[in-house]
Amino acid sequence: MLSPFDWRRGISSSGTGGTMAAQPLSSTAATTAAATGATAATAATAATTSATLSTAAASTSTTAAPSAGATWINHHLAVEADSSQPANGSDAQAGVEGPTMPAGYLPLYEDVETAAEDAGYALIDDISEWLLGSVGSEAAVGGPENSTNLAVTGANGTLAWLEALNSTQPAQSNSSAEDGERGRYSLRSFVEQQLAGGGAAGAGDGGDAGIALIDSGEEAALDNVADAETDYGMLGGFGDAELLQRTATVARETLGNRTAPSTTSYDGGGSGDVGVAGGLAGTAGGGVGGAGGSGGSTFMLLLENFNDYFPNYNGSTVSGTSTIAPGVAITGSRGSGLLLEQNLTGLYLDGYRLNCTNETLNLTDSCGELRVVDHNYWALILILFPILTLFGNILVILSVCRERSLQTVTNYFIVSLAIADLLVAVVVMPFAVYFLVNGAWALPDVVCDFYIAMDVICSTSSIFNLVAISIDRYIAVTQPIKYAKHKNSRRVCLTILLVWAISAAIGSPIVLGLNNTPNREPDVCAFYNADFILYSSLSSFYIPCIIMVFLYWNIFKALRSRARKQRAARKPHLSELTGGSVIENIAQTRRLAETALDSSRHASRILPDEAATNTASGSNEEEDENAISPDIDDCHVIVNDKSTEFMLATVVEETGNSVVAQITTQPQLVVADPNGNHDSGYAASNVDDVLAGVAPASASAATSAAPRSSGSPPDSPLPSGATLQRSSVSSQRRPTGDDSPKRGEPALRSVGVDNSSVAMKPLSFVRYGVQEAMTLARNDSTLSTTSKTSSRKDKKNSQASRFTIYKVHKASKKKREKSSAKKERKATKTLAIVLGVFLFCWLPFFSCNIMDAMCAKFKKDCRPGLTAYMMTTWLGYINSFVNPVIYTIFNPEFRKAFKKIMHMG
């Protein structure tokens, strides 16, 4: 971020909106010296020294034009000092040989409200101020010809420099003007000299090398930190002095790794560490441009040594063998600038972080906090999600283990999915809650790698299990014969093992060292390998999701095609029914119907079984929506008198609101003798799918049909061999006294059925006797008959006949097929909902993940922020909590199993 400008060592807050005002170096020197107990004379001497430096530098400003970096900084300095200067574009100040403002300003771009950025600026600021200040020029004190003689002391220039850094504390002035110039204030003097076009004898080479610190350093490092608050807060809670002290301590322990500088020539700003003084001041004593260039190049060496002595994130030191030594080809402005940018980038942008827990060096200084963090205690509420996720997925696993009806191929995959969700709740979510509440990652790196690896493995396993489920559903719907032939537990177990093996293969590289990259941050648990992020996101999410969407689309098309065919063949008219067809007779109602016989004009009533017991195997939830709907053709009761032709009359079904149904006559069917002498002793072979019909009394009776009466209704006839039926419910009860038929009322008998379509078993297993299921008794209401009177009347109609229930296998098979198809559709819909919720929960995270990797890989400023990552990550975790809820709502079998386990049903 290039604005607002801030002079880090000369900050003066106006108190209004945090506006920063620049202060001259002379004022700063006096103030600082006075604050540290220095005399007024000392402060005045420091101020005078600074002004002398600026004057001396300005006198040489015409020898060389400033570099592009110097011109850019110069322009902005001028704008700050003089509001009449152009506010944009450096061209307006091109070629200017000095600032138009008082000397002594160090331009740095700082967002004072961002701690991480502040720490990033502190790195460049401290390197600049203490690194250059410790070996600063004495040009103003002893003259240019002596500039290199007093720069540093000690046999080893590099170590002496580090010791000088250690002795220089922030906001402190040394006891003398010379020490102050050599120490704290030399950098500002140097910056002013370079902005004024210093480095005359060296043709600006030394000056360009110094400007590179401000130009290349800030552009390479600080501009990158502006949009990465948490990524580059590398100094955090460490004080500036502590950083330098630690650096010096590390240097003493690792002298063998440094780059040995040349110290053969101190004259004329020669090579070696002390050549920095000549290069920086631009006073190469020999008057040769190479001398100034050497000063700049050796300045690069200092930075490289600084890098060599700095411990990296895991406590080791950067090897000195990688140091780039200066040479003829890289001296001068261009070579020095490139070296500085490279070394400074290697030092800072590669992500050096202080990590006390991992350092093995003998560091005596306290580590302190990595950075100032805020604890988010509100995030503790998120602990509810792992608890609820654990509870729900345990219910899923126990339900399948305990209920044999749930032990299907699809549900085995659901168990595998529940195990993955269970691991998310136990292993992944707690670490995520900790990280969010604590505000920083303070656990060892190996724990972070384990957390990330389990996150990858579990989410990958979840989606691979959904892929396996979608393949299973696709084969079951599109190739049912093949599916029934090949499905077995062994194949399912192998598939599940393969799913987990692939998931582990994708996530395991994280714990094997793949995440140990140079830019790793100890207090942030994240994944830093952009290539692996791209690979894992594609292989574990995007490609499988494309496969699942394709499979489910084909499943839905197949189901839609099947539904169309079922609707086309749905509910034919009674006249179109063939032998063996089934029309169900409902027995579980409150009060059904009444009929009368024309021949006697005697009102008869059919008394329903009021104490009915439901013996159906399937619930209403499992009935096929394409089955015969309860409309006007659904409820049928047949009565007959032996002396008249068969009549079917109006029937009333009472289910809260009466529904009137008209049915037809069937002259071909015969009922048994009302005397009850030929009652059948057989019932349906499966009580679960009983059909409330009537049985043939005898072979002879089945063939003795009376001709149709001319007065019968003109409706289409009921086909031969049809059995009457309504729903898959049958009722049985013991008749009470009121239930017995009264004299003069014909009893309901049985209707003939095509024996080829009927299989019968003895009725002995029916609890109360199905034959007593329905009787004719009450006089609640009557209906007039719909046929003409017959001259014959059965004198024995007072005897209660019985009623026999049969099962037609053909109809039962169709019913089972419909029920099975219904279950297949419901299971597929449930799994499709699971898939949709999964995509909704995880797609945002993987989108952010792959965007971050692409931006990092191609070095674009488009990476999503920390807030987006946190929100999308937790949205993905919530998917593990939602899955059991989906089963509870949309799957009645799981719902029943859940209730049973929790003792709620």
Curated annotation (Swiss-Prot):
Query: Does Acyltransferase appear among the keywords?
Result: no
Q: Its principal location?
A: membrane
Where is composition skewed (Low complexity) in this entry?
Answer: 702-722
Q: In which tissues is it expressed?
A: Highest expression is in adult heads.
Keyword annotations for this protein, in alphabetical order, are:
Cell membrane, Disulfide bond, G-protein coupled receptor, Glycoprotein, Membrane, Receptor, Transducer, Transmembrane, Transmembrane helix
- Can you list the disulfide-bonded cysteine pairs? 448-525
Where, in residue ranges, is this chain on the Cytoplasmic side? 399-416, 472-493, 553-830, 891-905
Which GO terms fall under molecular function for this chain's record? dopamine neurotransmitter receptor activity, coupled via Gi/Go; G protein-coupled amine receptor activity; G protein-coupled receptor activity
**Ranges for region Disordered:** 1-23, 600-631, 702-753, 780-799
InterPro entries in UniProt? GPCR_Rhodpsn, GPCR_Rhodpsn_7TM
Q: How does it sit in the membrane?
A: Multi-pass membrane protein
Q: For bias kind Polar residues, which ranges apply?
A: 723-734
A cellular-component GO term for this protein? synapse
Q: Where in the cell is it found?
A: Cell membrane
Q: Which residues cross the membrane?
A: 378-398, 417-437, 451-471, 494-514, 532-552, 831-851, 870-890
Q: Where, in residue ranges, is this chain on the Extracellular side? A: 1-377, 438-450, 515-531, 852-869
Q: Glycans attached where?
A: 88, 146, 156, 166, 174, 257, 314, 343
Enumerate composition-biased segments (Basic and acidic residues): 735-746
**Alphabetical list of Gene3D superfamilies matching this protein:** Rhodopsin 7-helix transmembrane proteins
> Which processes are annotated in GO (biological process)?
anesthesia-resistant memory; G protein-coupled dopamine receptor signaling pathway; G protein-coupled receptor signaling pathway
Function according to Swiss-Prot or TrEMBL: Receptor for dopamine. The activity of this receptor is mediated by G proteins which inhibit adenylyl cyclase.
Say which family it is in: Belongs to the G-protein coupled receptor 1 family.
The record, for PANTHER family, names: ADRENERGIC RECEPTOR-RELATED G-PROTEIN COUPLED RECEPTOR, DOPAMINE D2-LIKE RECEPTOR
Q: What is this protein called?
A: Dopamine D2-like receptor
Q: Which gene encodes it?
A: Dop2R
